[in-house]
Amino acid sequence: ALQGLREALQRNPTNKNLKEALDIAPEDHSSAYLSYYNLAKSGFEEPMTTHSDHYNSNYGYSIAAYSKGEVFMEQLGYIVGADTRDKILLEYYKQWRFKHPNANDFIRVAEDVSGIQLDWYKEYWVNTIKTIDYKIDSLWEENGVSKIRLKRIGHIPMPIDLQLTFKDGSTEMFYVPLNLMFGAKPNENN
C-alpha cells in the first residue's frame, strides 16, 4: 500500500535537491501524469492500497507504484503550495528517518506543517480509482460583470486555481479553496 508513496518520497526530494545543486531546470512531471492518465483510461487501474502481489496486472502495479505516487506528491504541492510541500517533506524526513512510518504518518505531518486538512486527498487518491476532472461549464455577463461556472466531472474534489487572461493581455489568478480542507494554501502569485 505504501509503495507508491514511498517511491514518491524517495524520488521527489532527491531529484529536486540534486537539480538545485547542479543548477538544472526543475523536473518535468509530464511523463508521470501521462502514464497515470493512460492507466486511468485503460480500465486496469486499482487502488494504490492494493498489495503489490495482488494487482491484476504488472502494468497497473508499476504505474501505481511509481507514476501515481509521483503525481500524488506533485498534486500535494498544488493543494498546499509547492514551498509548503517541500517543508512537509523536510519535516517528514526529520521526524521519521530510520523509523517505520505508514501513510497516515505522512498525512499527519503534512497537515501539521500546512495547517490544512488532507485526509480527504489521501482517501480519494490512495484508496480509490476516482479521478480529478473539471471544466468550464458556462460563461456569461451579468450587470457588466463576467461570470464563470465550473463543473466537476470527475469524482475527486479539488481546490481550483483559475487564471483569467484579459483582452489587454494581463492576467489574474483566482483561487477557489475546497471546504474539505478547512484552510487555504498561501498566495503563490507574488
Q: Residue ranges of each PLM-predicted region?
A:
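Hydrophobic alpha-helical and helix-loop surface patches within well-folded domains
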Residues: 1-153, 157
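Long, His/Glu/Asp-enriched segments that create or flank divalent metal/ion-associated functional microenvironments
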Residues: 132-190
